[in-house]
């Protein structure tokens, strides 16, 4: 995405190192990456991207691992060390310097051709755009093209250095969130402090993602490549370092990506994207922390492998036709790390595929090489391809997959992406790798770049591709989209990475995993570009959330969600390289000729189709909403007209039934009901006005009308709407029945109080008192309270509840306490003897606590009314109560019983409810006491 500002590099590689090119990206994360690069390998010269078009394609970011400098110059000039942009493959310690030189020479030559393709096809500041379709890598780029690419890359870098709309609300919010996520992820990984020193080679994968700052578009869009690539056991090693650097550079890149998404992506609103991206970043950050820890613990060679894959990827990008030779040599030179990069040679076999596909694959390969999740996948695929060091194999295999899928075709596009990758290698690599994985599925070689196993890659890659795509989705999409959005013409690499990977991921997961690379690539280039652009954030996040949890998700190649997106896109499968440059592809006609070089079918359509299709989708969506609204609006006026003119129409017609029937069909059940009601009225009135026969008819109808006024709506509905009307009529009848029942129930409630003289009192007492005591109190005591209650009940309206509630407060507690002891005595003697024991029992209760005496008083109150009913008992009980309690207690109990009842009479409903509840509450308390 970010074209490094590089002087026209010599066509011949300088010791496998690209000529130094300076990225003008004052990014803090970028600087940190540079520091890491210097610390990790002071000897290496960072590869610079020749240009957004040329550099991305040619991007061979080379980084020397300890002894050997990774010379992945795909014709790309060296990047200044300060840039901190080092190829993930730079840590290839196994590769010899001579091998690097060979690669550099081969790759550089290829880059020339790719750059020429890129520069010539893209008239606008579209080195990115031109690179995307740059299918003919064989053609050498002229120095003018290189200069143009440099200028374009400088412009892009300047733009990227300062977010285009940093003041936008969405960007600010996203930046805050991303900072939080980065703090969490980097701190958890311990990479902020570790990046410069601890992660030298290991960080190279991460520093490559860290390089993403220069390449912020691709790096940001690949902010969390590591987690998506978790599927492979070694993905944590890569993903973690890559993520730290990516996180650091994500702040600028993700913000730009969000802006781009807002402008280009219709499906995913900015807020939604930010939320999803933040969730992915958080989830990926966890994965990255784990992965980084694993990577740090794991031997240095895996990081070296990661770097070497990046170099290979860049080389592959640089040389579409020479990709086979150079990547093959590279893979043979670096069995562990080179293989990943060698995949581009393997991909060379599918060179027939459009260059854009190769570019995607190579950029993806670079991303995996950066030390992002791809490492884990490569290990799985490596088993298929070559026996390499486990960590190295894994990463290499990932790169292989990416490059193999579209070796020659993808080279131009991928080199474009590679150019972006140098600045943000790990993030871009993650994102790119995911798209490459998808593209690669048919051609991706499983682990052996040396073997050029395009066939094998096609067979084995699908699994690997899914895994890598998943990783890529996490971070890179945001970066790439961000870059593309703010600028009408975005760096093709960054945009292609962001847009491609989601699309490729979806397409490959759902559709493309089995599909062969070459045919799918042309499909990619055409319309999927735009669709991919809109989809990338959602699909990437979704895929990442689903896949990242387990390395097992690699089979997600069969993942359904991405296919749905593919379905949404007319050419969803294989717009990966187009995806990143939807905007610029449209702007640049050159990409069309480039795509036509390898497969001109899809590329021109994709360019023109991206903006047009996006506009069409937007327009179609808007039209859909308006269309839905319009039908809603039209029926409403019709209903109004029908309702208003129903009477007139019916009058005009001798019989309004026909009109009514017609109207209900058009308007619906409810509308028909309203209209039908006037219809019978009209029928009656015109019948009366008509001649004698109509009068007879009116007489016949009149009874119907009389009977109908209530059922009319139902009958009319039944006539007009059928089942609907019948159901409606049934509902109405049921409602009426229920209403009647409720009215009947209310009188029943009123009736209940009248019999309450006997039953209600018993009902009230049993609810309040324990079972045994209820029986005892019912006969003697309840009748007089019933009379008292009845007197109060009619006043309150609800007689039962009040008396029960009033006693329950006072009587229930004492009864409950005494009930177990008194039940035997009281049940047998209901006369004064039970009252006395009750008083005796109450006496001990009084000292026990304040509550028992109050209940005791109410209890005698109950007994006292019962006794009062029978004069003999009255005399007995007061005497019995008075000696233990004293003269005060006996009067207090009746006073409390009577006065509170009289006072509480107005509270019947509340008292009844509370009484039942309180009785239950009191029982346990007294029993426990």
Swiss-Prot record:
This protein's GO CC annotations: actin cytoskeleton; bicellular tight junction; cytosol; dendritic spine; glutamatergic synapse; nucleus; perikaryon; plasma membrane
Summary of the tissues where the protein is detected: Expressed in cerebral cortex.
Statement: the UniProt record of this protein carries the keyword Cytoplasm: yes
Gene: SYNPO
PANTHER family to which the protein is assigned, alphabetical: PUTATIVE-RELATED (PTHR24217), SYNAPTOPODIN (PTHR24217:SF13)
Task of the protein: Actin-associated protein that may play a role in modulating actin-based shape and motility of dendritic spines and renal podocyte foot processes. Seems to be essential for the formation of spine apparatuses in spines of telencephalic neurons, which is involved in synaptic plasticity.
InterPro entries registered for this protein in UniProt: Synaptopodin_domain
Post-translational modification: O-glycosylated.
Basic and acidic residues composition-biased segments: 60-69, 91-110, 142-151, 646-656
Protein's organism: Homo sapiens (Human)
Protein name per its UniProtKB record: Synaptopodin
Biased composition (Pro residues): 1-12, 224-234
Localization, UniProt: Cytoplasm, Cytoskeleton; Cell junction, Tight junction; Perikaryon; Cell projection, Dendritic spine
UniProt keyword Cell inner membrane present: no
Annotated glycan sites: 330
Keywords: Acetylation, Actin-binding, Cell junction, Cell projection, Cytoplasm, Cytoskeleton, Glycoprotein, Phosphoprotein, Synapse, Tight junction
Subunit composition and interactions: Interacts with BAIAP1. Interacts with actin. Interacts (via PPxY motifs) with WWC1 (via WW domains).
Source domain of life: Eukaryota
């Amino acid at each position: 995405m970010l074209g490094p500002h590089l002087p026209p590099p010599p066509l011949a590689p300088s010791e496998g190192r690209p000529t130094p090119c300076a990225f003008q990206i004052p990014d803090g994360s970028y600087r940190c990456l540079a520091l890491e690069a210097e610390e990790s390998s002071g000897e290496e010269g960072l590869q610079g991207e020749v240009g957004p078009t040329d550099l991305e394609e040619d991007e061979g970011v080379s980084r020397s691992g300890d002894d050997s400098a990774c010379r992945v110059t795909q014709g790309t000039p060296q990047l200044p060390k300060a840039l901190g942009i080092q190829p993930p493959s730079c840590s290839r310690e196994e590769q010899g310097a001579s091998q690097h030189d060979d690669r550099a020479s081969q790759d550089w030559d290829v880059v020339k051709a790719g750059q020429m393709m890129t520069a010539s096809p893209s008239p606008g500041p579209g080195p990115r755009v031109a690179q995307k379709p740059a299918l003919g890598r064989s053609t050498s780029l002229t120095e003018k093209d290189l200069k143009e690419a440099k200028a374009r890359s400088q412009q892009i870098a300047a733009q990227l250095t300062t977010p285009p709309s940093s003041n936008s609300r969405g960007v600010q919010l996203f930046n805050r969130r991303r900072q939080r996520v980065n703090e969490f992820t980097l701190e958890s990984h311990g990479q902020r402090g570790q990046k410069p020193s601890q992660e030298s080679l290991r960080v190279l994968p991460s520093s490559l993602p860290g390089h993403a700052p220069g390449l912020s578009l691709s790096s940001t869009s690949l902010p969390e490549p590591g987690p998506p690539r978790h599927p492979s056991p070694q993905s944590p090693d890569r993903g973690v370092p890559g993520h730290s650097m990516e996180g650091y550079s994500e702040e600028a890149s993700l913000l730009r990506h969000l802006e781009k998404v807002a402008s280009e992506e219709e499906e995913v609103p900015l807020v939604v994207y930010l939320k999803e991206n933040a969730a992915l970043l958080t989830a990926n950050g966890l994965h990255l922390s784990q992965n980084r820890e694993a990577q740090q613990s794991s031997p240095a060679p895996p990081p070296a492998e990661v770097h070497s894959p990046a170099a290979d990827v860049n080389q592959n990008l640089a040389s579409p036709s020479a990709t086979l030779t150079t990547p093959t040599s590279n893979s043979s030179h670096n069995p562990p790390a080179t293989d990943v990069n060698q995949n581009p040679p393997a991909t060379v076999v599918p060179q027939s595929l459009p260059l854009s596909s190769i570019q995607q694959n190579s950029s993806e390969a670079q991303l995996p090489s950066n030390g992002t999740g791809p490492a884990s996948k490569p290990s799985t695929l490596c088993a298929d391809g070559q026996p390499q060091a486990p960590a190295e194999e894994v990463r290499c295999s990932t790169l292989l997959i990416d490059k193999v899928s579209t070796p020659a075709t993808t080279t131009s596009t991928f080199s474009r992406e590679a150019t972006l990758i140098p600045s943000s290698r790990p993030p871009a690599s993650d994102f790119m790798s995911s798209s490459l994985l998808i593209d690669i599925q048919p051609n991706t070689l499983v682990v052996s770049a040396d073997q050029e196993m395009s066939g094998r890659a096609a067979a084995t890659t699908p699994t690997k591709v899914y895994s890598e795509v998943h990783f890529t989705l996490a971070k890179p999409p945001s970066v790439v989209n961000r870059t593309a959005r703010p600028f009408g013409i975005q760096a093709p690499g960054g945009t292609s990475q962001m847009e491609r990977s989601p699309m490729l991921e979806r397409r490959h997961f759902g559709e493309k995993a089995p599909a062969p690379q070459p045919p799918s690539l042309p499909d990619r280039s055409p319309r999927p570009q735009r669709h991919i652009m809109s989809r990338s954030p959602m699909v990437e996040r979704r895929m990442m959330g689903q896949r990242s949890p387990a390395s097992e998700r690699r089979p997600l190649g069969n993942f359904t969600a991405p296919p749905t997106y593919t379905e949404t896109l007319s050419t969803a499968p294989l717009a990966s390289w187009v995806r990143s440059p939807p905007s610029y592809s449209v702007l640049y006609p050159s990409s069309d000729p480039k795509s036509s070089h390898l497969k001109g079918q899809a590329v021109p359509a994709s360019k023109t189709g991206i903006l047009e299709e996006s506009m069409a989708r937007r327009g179609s969506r808007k039209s859909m909403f308006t269309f839905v609204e319009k039908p809603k609006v039209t029926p409403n006026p019709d209903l109004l007209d029908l309702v208003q003119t129903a009477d007139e129409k019916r009058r005009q017609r001798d019989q309004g039934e026909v009109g009514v029937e017609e109207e209900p069909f058009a308007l619906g059940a409810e509308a028909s009901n309203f209209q039908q009601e006037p219809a019978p009225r009209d029928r009656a009135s015109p019948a009366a006005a008509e001649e004698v026969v109509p009068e007879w008819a009116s007489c016949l109808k009149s009874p119907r009308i009389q009977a109908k006024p209530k059922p009319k709506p139902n009958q009319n509905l039944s006539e007009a709407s059928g089942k609907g009307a019948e159901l409606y009529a049934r509902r109405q009848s049921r409602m009426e029945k229920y209403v009647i029942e409720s009215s009947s129930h209310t009188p029943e409630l009123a009736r209940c109080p009248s019999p309450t003289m006997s039953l209600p009192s018993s009902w009230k007492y049993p609810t309040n008192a324990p079972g045994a005591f209820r029986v005892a109190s019912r006969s003697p005591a309840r009748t007089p309270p019933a009379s008292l209650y009845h007197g109060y009940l009619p006043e309150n309206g609800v007689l039962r509840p009040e008396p029960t509630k009033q006693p329950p407060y006072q009587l229930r507690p004492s009864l409950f306490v005494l009930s177990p002891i008194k039940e035997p005595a009281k049940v047998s003697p209901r006369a004064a003897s039970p009252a006395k024991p009750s008083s005796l029992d109450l006496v001990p209760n009084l000292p026990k606590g304040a509550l028992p005496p109050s209940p005791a008083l109410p209890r005698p109150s109950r007994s006292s009314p019962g006794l009062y009913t029978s004069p003999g008992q009255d005399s007995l009980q007061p005497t019995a109560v008075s000696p233990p309690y004293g003269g005060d207690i006996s009067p207090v109990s009746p006073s409390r019983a009577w006065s509170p009842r009289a006072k509480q009479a107005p509270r019947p409903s509340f008292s009844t409810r509370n009484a039942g509840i309180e009785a239950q509450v009191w029982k346990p308390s007294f029993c426990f006491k």
